[in-house]
Amino acid sequence: MSEDSSALPWSINRDDYELQEVIGSGATAVVQAAYCAPKKERVAIKRINLEKCQTSMDELLKEIQAMSQCHHPNIVSYYTSFVVKDELWLVMKLLSGGSVLDIIKHIVAKGEHKGGVLDESTIATILREVLEGLEYLHKNGQIHRDVKAGNILLGEDGSVQIADFGVSAFLATGGDITRNKVRKTFVGTPCWMAPEVMEQVRGYDFKADIWSFGITAIELATGAAPYHKYPPMKVLMLTLQNDPPSLDTGVQDKEMLKKYGKSFRKMISLCLQKDPEKRPTAAELLRHKFFQKAKNKEFLQEKILQRAPTISERSKKVRRVPGSSGRLHKTEDGGWEWSDDEFDEESEEGKAAISQLRSCPTQQHCLCLLQLFSAADPMGTLLQVPEQISAHLPQPASQMPTQPAQVSLLPPAEPAKPAQARSSGERSQETKVPISLVLRLRNSKKELNDIRFEFTPGRDTAEGVSQELISAGLVDGRDLVIVAANLQKIVEEPQSNRSVTFKLASGVEGSDIPDDGKLIGFAQLSIS
């Protein structure tokens, strides 16, 4: 590169960029290599479709301006941005080594992962650089919100940089991002998402990135996130209900994990603590014993870049039509597939989610997943109750009623029938027989309600029914996951789980004290 070309500012003229191979894609964006003629330099251009983006350009440009002021060797450099028709083009540094996810897939495809995908020294070297980048972001009041192998890029010299900082998350929130350090926006990929981000109750801070970092550490060793086989809603349930995942979670062949030692496992467990306050900061993690195994970038260059697929090899695997957008996107073969903002339909979790969607019997129950990952801020007030349902709700009273008010969602022609005791084998043969249930909880006026409804195995889904209860204004939107999880528990084992009491994510208000007996901050779901 000549001195003259290097001194030139980055062009904002579309004609100065020659688009080349597609090297990555998501539902709302495509990333292409390009050649910038005035600068005589190859770059990466992320083309974001603005068609469905609710963010004003003024707000979006402010965020990009803040992003462009981030200068760190472990953060991908953003050069400039401009609008081309209905797309926002982000011009970035091209890292020709691709993502760590590309390398993981390449190793797995060649069958070279039987003893673990990457060794400890390689993992430590990559993750130390990621921590340096996260420490910089966190010190500057920024949260990445989507740390994963697919967003860790490698340069041909073995350098490591974090990508997709800022803009993807900003677009997903409709621009509703303040500069404070606590977020209440629901963005990120479910498998890597921290529990507090899923709960949407207290908001979250930079410690959410530390959880995602821990999941990424597992991904680099095993080749996938712990719950990668499950569709998004199931991932949310497992993360919230189960103990934190570990290196062994979901791995059938434990032999592949034998070479990973105690310090690596301990580092992961520190990151994956459900209480974010107990997780270490990026700066504290950098002092962890495990990172003494880290080498330099020449080590990465020799160790894994020689095994990595080339840009042209990676580009052949991108099947989505560039420029397609939306939650349901069209593929090259003309079919439609669902994904979240940056969902990789080649990944295991992508396949599971798409399979879940295709098996949905009705559009009504498919919508729950689409709404869960919509750009709208999920932290709004309780949904308004439609008039036809509000007529059945109890009227305001000075004291809480001794008997719960009855709210029925059962079809008028088919009154609720008591579920008869049947063996699990008999029930599986009679999948069309509905289970009558009652959800008892307090409404916004603190009055007890009994909400009666039916669940038909083989037709209904727990998340679909829960979404309907929320849409009817009977359940707080923040309780979607916890209600769905307990409904799933009952319908899977109706004989052993005829009634469950559980804590609500929406919690209690003011001076109220949670009480599972009086159902203050709790709900009860039973087979009637």
From Swiss-Prot:
<keyword id="KW-0418">Kinase</keyword>
<feature type="modified residue" description="Phosphoserine">
    <location>
        <position position="325"/>
    </location>
</feature>
<dbReference type="GO" id="GO:0006979">
    <property type="term" value="P:response to oxidative stress"/>
</dbReference>
<dbReference type="GO" id="GO:0071474">
    <property type="term" value="P:cellular hyperosmotic response"/>
</dbReference>
<keyword id="KW-0723">Serine/threonine-protein kinase</keyword>
<feature type="modified residue" description="Phosphoserine">
    <location>
        <position position="359"/>
    </location>
</feature>
<feature type="binding site">
    <location>
        <position position="46"/>
    </location>
    <ligand>
        <name>ATP</name>
    </ligand>
</feature>
<dbReference type="GO" id="GO:0006884">
    <property type="term" value="P:cell volume homeostasis"/>
</dbReference>
<feature type="compositionally biased region" description="Acidic residues">
    <location>
        <begin position="334"/>
        <end position="348"/>
    </location>
</feature>
<dbReference type="InterPro" id="IPR011009">
    <property type="entry name" value="Kinase-like_dom_sf"/>
</dbReference>
<dbReference type="Pfam" id="PF00069">
    <property type="entry name" value="Pkinase"/>
</dbReference>
<dbReference type="GO" id="GO:0009410">
    <property type="term" value="P:response to xenobiotic stimulus"/>
</dbReference>
<keyword id="KW-0808">Transferase</keyword>
<dbReference type="InterPro" id="IPR000719">
    <property type="entry name" value="Prot_kinase_dom"/>
</dbReference>
<dbReference type="GO" id="GO:0038116">
    <property type="term" value="P:chemokine (C-C motif) ligand 21 signaling pathway"/>
</dbReference>
<keyword id="KW-0597">Phosphoprotein</keyword>
<feature type="modified residue" description="Phosphoserine">
    <location>
        <position position="428"/>
    </location>
</feature>
<dbReference type="InterPro" id="IPR050629">
    <property type="entry name" value="STE20/SPS1-PAK"/>
</dbReference>
<comment type="function">
    <text>Effector serine/threonine-protein kinase component of the WNK-SPAK/OSR1 kinase cascade, which is involved in various processes, such as ion transport, response to hypertonic stress and blood pressure. Specifically recognizes and binds proteins with a RFXV motif. Acts downstream of WNK kinases (WNK1, WNK2, WNK3 or WNK4): following activation by WNK kinases, catalyzes phosphorylation of ion cotransporters, such as SLC12A1/NKCC2, SLC12A2/NKCC1, SLC12A3/NCC, SLC12A5/KCC2 or SLC12A6/KCC3, regulating their activity.</text>
</comment>
<keyword id="KW-0067">ATP-binding</keyword>
<dbReference type="GO" id="GO:0070294">
    <property type="term" value="P:renal sodium ion absorption"/>
</dbReference>
<comment type="similarity">
    <text>Belongs to the protein kinase superfamily. STE Ser/Thr protein kinase family. STE20 subfamily.</text>
</comment>
<keyword id="KW-0460">Magnesium</keyword>
<keyword id="KW-0007">Acetylation</keyword>
<dbReference type="GO" id="GO:0004674">
    <property type="term" value="F:protein serine/threonine kinase activity"/>
</dbReference>
<dbReference type="InterPro" id="IPR024678">
    <property type="entry name" value="Kinase_OSR1/WNK_CCT"/>
</dbReference>
<dbReference type="GO" id="GO:0019901">
    <property type="term" value="F:protein kinase binding"/>
</dbReference>
<feature type="region of interest" description="Disordered">
    <location>
        <begin position="394"/>
        <end position="429"/>
    </location>
</feature>
<dbReference type="GO" id="GO:0071476">
    <property type="term" value="P:cellular hypotonic response"/>
</dbReference>
<dbReference type="InterPro" id="IPR017441">
    <property type="entry name" value="Protein_kinase_ATP_BS"/>
</dbReference>
<feature type="region of interest" description="Disordered">
    <location>
        <begin position="313"/>
        <end position="350"/>
    </location>
</feature>
<feature type="modified residue" description="Phosphothreonine; by WNK1">
    <location>
        <position position="185"/>
    </location>
</feature>
<feature type="modified residue" description="N-acetylserine">
    <location>
        <position position="2"/>
    </location>
</feature>
<dbReference type="GO" id="GO:1990869">
    <property type="term" value="P:cellular response to chemokine"/>
</dbReference>
<dbReference type="GO" id="GO:0007231">
    <property type="term" value="P:osmosensory signaling pathway"/>
</dbReference>
<feature type="binding site">
    <location>
        <begin position="23"/>
        <end position="31"/>
    </location>
    <ligand>
        <name>ATP</name>
    </ligand>
</feature>
<keyword id="KW-0547">Nucleotide-binding</keyword>
<feature type="modified residue" description="Phosphoserine">
    <location>
        <position position="347"/>
    </location>
</feature>
<protein>
    <recommendedName>
        <fullName>Serine/threonine-protein kinase OSR1</fullName>
        <ecNumber>2.7.11.1</ecNumber>
    </recommendedName>
</protein>
<dbReference type="GO" id="GO:0005829">
    <property type="term" value="C:cytosol"/>
</dbReference>
<dbReference type="GO" id="GO:0035556">
    <property type="term" value="P:intracellular signal transduction"/>
</dbReference>
<dbReference type="Pfam" id="PF12202">
    <property type="entry name" value="OSR1_C"/>
</dbReference>
